[in-house]
Regions:
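A conserved ligand/cofactor-binding region detector
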Residues: 1-107, 117, 122-136, 140
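N-terminal alpha-helical segment
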Residues: 111-114
């Protein structure tokens, strides 16, 4: 892991994302993917955050860490064309980042099947995935 780049992202993230829980989630996604706990990661910058993001700088820092990123704008509803979030998908290769994007599209559209591969891709422990599959997605 390139410590300089992750330190810079860690110092920068709270200047963009004001919600502390979201900062922690973003950093956990990035670090988890970097150290191999997760194969892929996904998170987003909301409208009030994305205007503060230098996406070229962010991409460069992720690349310095050995991560590839795919960005995508997703509308948040309503008639305002500026009401969108900037999603990002991470992986050790561009193909993995694109796979993450595809998996999340399937999940959001309801076109996916519960299976171990999605859980593994997202970095969940086998026991958690098995429990989820056993309960058929009901987490009560």
């Amino acid at each position: 892991m390139e410590k300089c780049a992750i330190s810079e992202i860690d110092a920068w993230m709270p200047t963009v994302v004001k919600d502390k829980a979201s900062v922690v989630r973003n950093m956990a996604e990035i670090v988890g993917t970097d150290i191999g706990v997760k194969t892929v990661a996904m998170d987003c910058f909301l409208p009030e955050e994305r205007e503060k993001v230098d996406f070229v700088w962010f991409r460069r820092k992720l690349h310095e860490m050995g991560l590839h990123v795919v960005f995508e704008r997703r509308a948040l509803g309503g008639s305002d064309p500026w009401n969108f979030a900037e999603y990002y998908y991470l992986g050790k290769t561009r193909d993995i980042a694109l796979t993450a994007q595809s998996v999340f599209h399937k999940i959001w559209s309801g076109e996916w099947e519960m299976n171990r591969e999605i859980g593994k891709l997202l970095g969940y422990p086998t026991t958690a995935v098995d429990y989820f599959l056993k309960k058929k997605g009901e987490m009560s």
